[in-house]
Amino acid sequence: MLYPSVDKLQKTVPSKYTIVTVAAKRARQIQDGKRVKVANPKSYKPVGKALEELFSGEVVVTNQPQD
């Protein structure tokens, strides 16, 4: 079972595609050695940890135009 669920995540980030993109980028950072911002994450995989960070508000989505 995925924690947090996609439905819960969509309350903070409305687009499923944005959730996937942000979680993937953050998971790569975690995998490359960046510190996890959530204390005692339930997941042991980088993607799960990234989703938990997104749900808790530790990772914030900002819209920045691409050049």
Swiss-Prot record:
Promotes RNA polymerase assembly. Latches the N- and C-terminal regions of the beta' subunit thereby facilitating its interaction with the beta and alpha subunits. The keyword RNA-binding does not apply. Transmembrane segments: none annotated. NCBIfam families: rpoZ. Keywords: DNA-directed RNA polymerase, Nucleotidyltransferase, Transcription, Transferase. Pfam families: RNA_pol_Rpb6. This is DNA-directed RNA polymerase subunit omega. Its EC number is 2.7.7.6. GO terms for biological process: DNA-templated transcription. Gene3D superfamilies: 3.90.940.10. It catalyses: RNA(n) + a ribonucleoside 5'-triphosphate = RNA(n+1) + diphosphate. One of its GO terms (molecular function) is DNA-directed RNA polymerase activity. The RNAP catalytic core consists of 2 alpha, 1 beta, 1 beta' and 1 omega subunit. When a sigma factor is associated with the core the holoenzyme is formed, which can initiate transcription. It comes from Exiguobacterium sibiricum (strain DSM 17290 / CCUG 55495 / CIP 109462 / JCM 13490 / 255-15). Belongs to the RNA polymerase subunit omega family. PANTHER family: DNA-DIRECTED RNA POLYMERASE SUBUNIT OMEGA. One of its GO terms (cellular component) is DNA-directed RNA polymerase complex.
